[in-house]
Amino acid sequence: MHQRLTLKLHQRSKTMKITSALKTCVSVLVVSGITIATAQAVTPEDKGLEIAKEIDRRDLGFGDSRTELQMLLTNRHGDKSVRKLRLATLENQDTDAGDKSLTVFSHPRDIKGTAFLSFTKILDPDDQWLYLPALKRVKRISSANKSGPFVGSEFAYEDLVSFEVGKYDYKWLRDEPCGELDCFVVERFPKYENSGYTRQTVWVDKSEYRIRKIDFYDRKESLLKTLNQSGFEQYLEQYWRPLKMVMKNHQTGKATELAFSPYEFRLGVNENAFTPNRLKRLK
């Protein structure tokens, strides 16, 4: 009798321990499941922002660069005209502002010496100046005119600033093939004032986070332009640059193609060259 009672108590104690252990395991699994679910519950906005941050991170530290390029303008009738120019870019170490760029035209004769200087900001208006030799004066580009065409091309002034994460809100839309690559498709919405665009749809390749294509939508939500970038080359084993950019205006039928010569990096570009007062002396 005593042995039976002892055995029953032992079995009951063992059963309680097993039950307690099972409850603990279930609790751990439930908590783990919540943690995993929380980690996986990334919103499209969060994912879009992370993609933008990775694009930016991969281009940090280039210092300065220089290249020459040809601009080919095509009107709606297929008539073409060619311009030649050079471009210098200076990376800004200030996280509150973007890069500085200087563009100088060398051909044809009627626009030779025309120079464009741009200081990219985040949400404040970008500082931009245009020197026109015929007028012999430096003109500051009004923030209200950032959507205007740059020297008759299909690129707007706001297209000619460096990419800065803080200029936009983001939303990941989907993943899809883009040519032979796989791409993220991300929508971005300008946060800065006076943009000519309500939104932009951006195709970013997954392998190197290079922007391959951008669709621009105007203030009426109509597709305005498409930019295609191709012929990417890598420099300093890190920095990718497209050697061909084509901006097609769907509403006018016009197009502008930029064909770049190979880039040169870390030449020790003098920051003093990036000042409005120097524009008149450039050739």
Residues covered by each model-derived region:
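N-terminal mature ectodomain segment of secretory-pathway/periplasmic proteins
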Residues: 44-134
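Surface-exposed beta-loop interaction hotspot
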Residues: 164-168, 175
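Gly/Pro-enriched, hydrophobic low-complexity segments
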Residues: 106, 117-119, 127-131, 137-141, ...
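Bacterial N-terminal signal peptides that target proteins for export
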Residues: 5, 14-26
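Short, ordered beta-strand-loop transition motifs
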Residues: 91-97, 173-182, 235-237
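C-terminal segment of classical bacterial N-terminal signal peptides
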Residues: 31-40
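Short, solvent-exposed mixed-charge patches
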Residues: 282-283
